[in-house]
Design a protein with these regions (language model features):
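Short, acidic loop-to-helix structural element flanking the phosphoryl-transfer center
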Residues: 75-103, 113
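Asp-based, Mg2+/Mn2+-dependent phosphohydrolase catalytic module
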Residues: 1-2, 95, 109, 113-166
Length: 166
């Protein structure tokens, strides 16, 4: 019998991208102030919804904010992301079993990709869903038997048990 797939919360189980997101918004507010004012505190807390607002903001002359986010994240990843030995061991163990592994986050895809690469998790996961509704999209793709690792503790427990209650 095949083991159930695992959906992993990037921010809860692998590395929290929110502080880097906040730093980017503060930088963007300052950097693009003369082009298009930005008030980070007025953005929705859900980063998928915030990204949609930033897309509209960028149309006022800012340009490719997503590319700017990716460059910003690449420059600052070593400060913000510290690979966890527990998480790395758990991912290795899960990947060795042949389970389908997916990661979800409400962060924009550009930030998620940088975080996964820096945390050493990118090559171990099959699917990555980012932005608004990412968790739901990933669970739909992986199927109803998917175990969810919302925290690092969940990830370790699932890897040690070989199975988890959905």
């Amino acid at each position: 019998m095949a083991l159930s797939p695992v959906a992993i919360d990037l921010d809860g189980a692998l590395g929290d991208t929110r502080p880097l997101w906040v730093d980017f918004l503060v930088d963007a507010e300052r950097r693009y102030a003369s082009i298009a004012p930005l008030d980070p505190s007025a953005l929705p807390k859900d980063r998928g919804a915030a990204a949609e607002e930033l897309d509209r903001w960028a149309e006022r002359g800012v340009g490719d904010w997503r590319g700017a986010l990716e460059r910003f994240a690449e420059d600052r990843a070593p400060v913000h992301f510290r690979p966890s030995a527990d998480a790395a061991t758990a991912l290795r163990a899960l990947a060795a079993t042949g389970r389908r592994l997916g990661v979800y986050t409400d962060a924009p895809a550009e930030l998620a990709a940088v975080a996964l690469a820096h945390l050493g998790a990118g090559r171990r996961v099959e699917l990555v869903e980012a932005g608004a509704g990412a968790r739901e999209r990933l669970l739909a793709e992986l199927g109803p038997d998917t175990a969810v690792a919302a925290s690092r503790e969940d990830l370790v427990r699932i890897s040690e048990s070989g199975r988890e209650k959905p």
